[in-house]
Amino acid sequence: MTGQPSTPVRPGSVVRTVRRHRGGRSATVQDMVAAEMPVAFNYNGVPFAVMMATPEDLEDFALGFSLSEGIVDHPQDLRVVAVDTFLEGASLQIEIPPERAAALDQRRRNLDGRSGCGVCGNESIEAVLRVPPVLQSALRIDVDALARALDALHARQPIAAQTGAVHAAGWADAQGMVQLVREDVGRHNALDKLIGALARARVDATQGFAVVTSRASYEMAMKAAQARIPLLAAISAPTALAISLADSAGLTLIGFARDHDCVVYSHPQRLDLGVAVGEPA
C-alpha cells in the first residue's frame, strides 16, 4: 500500500495503514515501521557521502562516522555546523581542518542505497585491509557482565520494540552496566552513532565493551578497533576476515552472545568464563 501519507511518531518510526492477516482473520490496522532516509555528509561545504539511515542522533552519527572512517582522529577536530532535516532526507554540515579536507579529495564515494558502510571511499585492497594500532587495554569482564549488558541492550531499544526493523549498539562498563545505546536501520550506522555518543560524552571507550544486535563483519570489527573499544560482542556470527582483523588489532571478538552463552574468537583473556581451560562449558 504505497503512496499513502504517513504520520511521524518519533524521528525513528512512522505509522502506516496496513492489512494484517493473523490466525485466519484479516483487519486494517495502524502499524509502526522504521523510518529510513538519505543522510548527506558535507565536509567544509563539499558533498562527501550519502548514507541510508534512521533520522535520529544525527550529530552522534556525524562524529562517529568521521572517527571510525579515519576522517578525523580526535573529536575536537570536528564541528557539526548544522543538521538540516527535510521531508526527503537530512544534510549534515561538518567542519574539519583544511588538511583533513584535502585528504578527502583523494577518497571516492559510491554509497547510494547502502544502510551504512565500514570501508567507505577506499580505492585499494591495502587501504581496506589496514590494521589500526594494536589495542592496549587491561579490561577484563566476566560472563555475568556480558549477559547483563545483553539483557539491558534488549530493554533499551524503543525503535526496535515499535518496528522490529532496526539494529542497536550499546556500550557497557566492566560490570556490564549499559551506559549508552544507539539504534539505526544499518548496523554500521548504529555502531557509528554509539562511537559518536561516547566521544561527545567524553567516555573512555577502553574501560568497557560494545554489544551489537547483528553479525560481526569486518567493517564492524574495524570500527570498534578504530574507536579503541577493546571488546565487541555480537549476537550473531563473525566473518573470517573480522576474526583476522580482531586478532591483529588486539580486539576481543565475541559471537553468538546470548544470555550466558558465547563464542570467543580472539584475545580471550578479556573474558572470564568461570571455567578452566579445557573444561566443557
Swiss-Prot record:
The keyword Cytoplasm applies. Gene3D superfamilies: 3.10.20.10, Cytidine Deaminase, domain 2. SUPFAM superfamilies: Cytidine deaminase-like. It is found in: Cytoplasm. It holds the Pfam family FdhD-NarQ. The keyword Cytoplasm applies. One of its GO terms (cellular component) is cytoplasm. One of its GO terms (molecular function) is sulfur carrier activity. One of its GO terms (biological process) is Mo-molybdopterin cofactor biosynthetic process. Keywords: Cytoplasm, Molybdenum cofactor biosynthesis. InterPro entries: Cytidine_deaminase-like (IPR016193), FdhD (IPR003786). The active site is at residue 117. PANTHER family: FORMATE DEHYDROGENASE, SULFUR CARRIER PROTEIN FDHD. Required for formate dehydrogenase (FDH) activity. Acts as a sulfur carrier protein that transfers sulfur from IscS to the molybdenum cofactor prior to its insertion into FDH. HAMAP family: FdhD (MF_00187). Belongs to the FdhD family. This is Sulfur carrier protein FdhD. It comes from Xanthomonas campestris pv. campestris (strain ATCC 33913 / DSM 3586 / NCPPB 528 / LMG 568 / P 25). The gene is fdhD.
